Amino acid sequence: MPFGNTHNKWKLNYSAAEEFPDLSKHNNHMAKALTLDIYKKLRDKETPSGFTLDDIIQTGVDNPGHPFIMTVGCVAGDEECYEVFKDLFDPVIEDRHGGYKPTDKHKTDLNQENLKGGDDLDPNYVLSSRVRTGRSIKGIALPPHCSRGERRLVEKLCIDGLATLTGEFQGKYYPLSSMSDAEQQQLIDDHFLFDKPISPLLLASGMARDWPDGRGIWHNNDKTFLVWVNEEDHLRVISMQKGGNMKEVFRRFCVGLKKIEDIFVKAGRGFMWNEHLGYVLTCPSNLGTGLRGGVHVKIPHLCKHEKFSEVLKRTRLQKRGTGGVDTAAVGSIYDISNADRLGFSEVEQVQMVVDGVKLMVEMEKRLENGKSIDDLMPAQK
């Protein structure tokens, strides 16, 4: 849990070696990047809002990692973190985002017209389609570090702004604090709402403080466009629907996101963005587009095939269980999404999902008929 700066200054009574965390059993990007020299150099620094190196790394110290998934192991507490503590964040970002250099520039493309295809994914295999991203409001500390007042301000800005949306985006805000446990659970089971903050990563980073104060969900009347407020990021914007029409999901995502950004800019509150990191978010894994385009696809034959993981690697996609990270695939239904966030535009990332999933469905149909998929193996993207 993040401490005040007085506590950080008190720690300086001890040497860097005495304060350096034991990372000997850790499997995360932070543990890989953090050396005693870096710790020594950065331990007395703090951002203007008072976030420190120990605040950044605490979640990765407390959670050594996952046997199959390399976790990130650090979070940002405000926009300035990525600059003040770049000696740690730069190697973490480079390692997590496939060699993305401190001098690289990120590209943004939210023009849905540039997506090719995506309206013809076979609904017998592709059960649902979803695109999400995160956004952070300039001048307000991020969830690991924000005060109650800041968090409530984010919520108020969202309530006031989203209430002005019309047409297909007209909807309503539901604060978590006034929901019954049964209502919350139903929304979680329907994949509309974030889980309760029981994840050790959320707890150790300080993101679950004061729960459920200032948290909520807004969705349009059709429940196809949602905004999560004050979970891991200030805003999580989600477009989703049943079936395989990723083109329509992406169109709604781009149009709705633009409307939301315009509302915040008009209120004098733009989103955190820079040309190196793209959209600035709490977890370094989401920098860039913050975008995850995913489908639930049923592939009972392909998922057992020896080349399944190679197909994923070559198409730059990743698999999760039916319920998301750390869950099992129920009935051979996998959540397949883009592996990249930084260095590729939104259109490029969704295009990879569309093309890769289309190929997987084709492979599944081949395997159903007892045929080989060797000639369908893609080149490395």
Curated annotation (Swiss-Prot):
Show where the Phosphagen kinase N-terminal domain sits: 11-98
The terms under GO molecular function for this entry are:
ATP binding; creatine kinase activity
- What reaction is this protein's catalytic activity? creatine + ATP = N-phosphocreatine + ADP + H(+)
Q: Which UniProt keywords apply?
A: ATP-binding, Cytoplasm, Kinase, Nucleotide-binding, Transferase
| Record-annotated Phosphagen kinase C-terminal domain positions | 125-367
Residues reported to bind ATP: 128-132, 191, 236, 292, 320-325, 335
Enzyme Commission number(s) from the entry = 2.7.3.2
Indicate the secretion signal residues: none
- Asked if the Swiss-Prot or TrEMBL record annotates the protein with the keyword ATP-binding, the reply is yes
Annotated Gene Ontology cellular components are: cytoplasm; extracellular space
Instruction: Provide one Gene Ontology biological process annotation.
Output: phosphocreatine biosynthetic process
Quaternary structure, from the entry: Dimer of identical or non-identical chains. With MM being the major form in skeletal muscle and myocardium, MB existing in myocardium, and BB existing in many tissues, especially brain.
Record function comment? Reversibly catalyzes the transfer of phosphate between ATP and various phosphogens (e.g. creatine phosphate). Creatine kinase isoenzymes play a central role in energy transduction in tissues with large, fluctuating energy demands, such as skeletal muscle, heart, brain and spermatozoa.
Other noteworthy facts: This electric ray muscle-specific creatine kinase (MM isozyme) is isolated from the electric organ, which derives embryologically from skeletal muscle. It may be involved in the electrical discharge process.
The protein depicted here goes by the name: Creatine kinase M-type
